[in-house]
Design a protein with these regions (language model features):
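Extended, solvent-exposed, turn-rich assembly/linker loops in the middle of proteins
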Residues: 134-230
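Alpha-helical scaffold segments that mediate packing/assembly in large oligomeric complexes
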Residues: 97-168, 310-320
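Extended, compositionally biased alpha-helical segments that mediate assembly or anchoring
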Residues: 273-320
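Short helix/loop capping segments that flank catalytic or ligand/cofactor-binding pockets
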Residues: 60-63, 101-102, 184-187, 194, ...
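Short, catalytically relevant binding-site loops at active-site mouths
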Residues: 180-184, 234, 248-250, 283, ...
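N-terminal "assembly arms/tails" that initiate or stabilize quaternary assembly
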Residues: 1-81, 312-314, 318-320
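Short acidic, glycine/tyrosine-flanked loop/strand segments centered on an H-E-D-like triad
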Residues: 75-100
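Glycine/small-residue-rich hydrophobic helix-like segments
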Residues: 225-280
């Protein structure tokens, strides 16, 4: 008969320590906001605000041959300011805790956790700034996104939201939407439907999308790629580069607000890039380390009414 010398409820079990060998960090959405913004630097000795100045328009007129030009106009300028504020995150690790804990890399891992927290706030602040565009809002609460919403919003941005005084922006135009809306957008591009003839559109504002087959519509490489890779294959629709960010807030009614905007219209001003600053100088804390990650930045809009349109759509969790 075999003798069990160690194990749960057996001999010597009190002598078996619990040793953890796998240590993992919870993952946050890394986000895309800095990649779709115009980045600027508030350098030392430049004050507390970064300014962008733009000059107004003047109008050209027909004049009669030989007549004196009497059309003098005032040239005006407008300054838009962006004032960074500090952001910080802190954890204090006790000296005795670090000596006793099973994770030999606790200090380094904690530093990465703090950096992740800073990055999460930075990106979330950027998604919140999208609501400050003041062009025409596309969609509404409960509306399911479609390709036409994206291309329509992009078409407006391409003329600066004005037919009377077109103001085409420089650079790329982006759409930042929630991944759950992008999932539906991708399904409508295949398109998925609940009947073979394609009479019912894919997507519902309660998450019951019902797409069980492929209906007639667009075909080719993009559709095939979307079927394989989902919304990550969206790419560009109507000259608008579609990006997703799960840090966009979804309200109690399953709706979110993102934007279709010109990169020129979303501003990120950095004063201090995030830095990890460990401090163990306080001897009364007996070996404790105070870990601080801090930086200084601000998000803002430029030409908010011309260069961006908010978009509000459903972001229900899929149920079918």
């Amino acid at each position: 008969m075999a003798t069990v010398l160690a194990g749960p409820g057996q001999a010597l079990d009190a002598s078996l320590p619990t040793i953890y060998r796998e240590f993992r960090l919870l993952r946050d959405e890394t986000g895309v906001m800095r990649s779709v913004a115009t980045s600027m630097k508030l350098a030392a000795h430049e004050g507390n605000t970064k300014y962008i100045s733009n000059y107004g328009r003047v109008t050209a007129y027909n004049v009669s041959d030989g007549a004196d030009i009497a059309q003098a106009q005032n040239l005006a300028d407008t300054a838009t300011g962006y004032s960074p504020t500090e952001v910080a995150v802190q954890v204090i690790l006790g000296g005795r805790t670090m000596r006793r804990v099973a994770d030999p890399d606790l200090l380094g891992r904690t530093g990465r956790i703090l950096n992740n927290a800073y990055d999460l706030k930075e990106d979330t602040d950027g998604t919140t700034q999208l609501q400050s565009f003041t062009g025409t809002t596309m969609g509404a609460a409960g509306v399911v996104i479609s390709p036409g919403h994206i291309s329509g919003a992009g078409a407006r941005v391409m003329i600066g939201n004005s037919r009377a005084n077109p103001e085409p922006p420089n650079g790329d135009i982006f759409a930042v939407i929630h991944p759950l809306a992008a999932h539906v957008l991708a399904g409508r591009l295949v398109p998925y439907t609940d009947v073979p003839t394609g009479t019912t559109a894919f997507g519902a504002n309660n998450g019951a999308h019902g797409g069980v087959t492929v209906g007639p519509g667009r075909s080719g490489g993009m559709s095939d790629d979307i079927i394989r890779r989902g919304y990550k294959a969206l790419g560009t629709i109507g000259s608008v580069i579609v990006k997703t960010d799960a840090n966009l807030a979804v309200d109690a009614n399953d709706d979110f607000t993102g934007a279709v905007f010109a990169k020129e219209g979303l501003i990120y001003v950095s004063e201090e890039e995030p830095r990890l600053d460990p401090d163990s100088s306080d001897k009364s804390m007996r070996g404790a380390v105070e870990l601080n990650v801090w930086g200084s930045y601000v998000w803002g809009n430029y030409r908010a009414s011309a260069y961006g349109n908010p978009v509000t759509f459903d972001a229900s969790l899929p149920t079918s």
